[in-house]
Amino acid sequence: MDALRDAARGGRVNHAFAEKIMMVVTSVNGCRYCSYGHSRAALATGVPETELQKLMALDLEAFPENEVVALTFAQHYAESHCNPDPAAWQRVTSYYGEETANDIMTYLRMITFGNLLGNTFDALLSRFSGKPAQGSNLWSELSVLLGAIWLPPFRLFIRLFKSKTGNACI
């Protein structure tokens, strides 16, 4: 969460560009909740609807070079199930610099986690309606969703503990 806050406040990746990056990952992963939410957020940041449609269709060639490097990497990152080719990551780092590249990676990880939660929730809903998602099981669906529930209070506890003890090891 600290990395996300730092990325958002750092100003190296503006909000519209961050939304474009997240829309590409969401298009690959197919999360309907993230698609809806980030489409609205992208439009609110000034991304034209025509660009949004291209992002959702993964038609990335028309975007300017200063965006297409990150957008094509975002697609590769999602399609490789978070295991990108090191040469592809090196291209992002070389093009944007290490700090901006790390901010881009933070957005990629955040939206991937969001997509996982949304798709897992959909799998659980499908299971309840008698149509379990292929390749999924009740245990993994419940584990992911329950894990997401305890994460915010745990992070709050860690943050409070660090501020009282000054211990950054946790």
Locate predicted features.
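Hydrophobic alpha-helical segments
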Residues: M1-I170
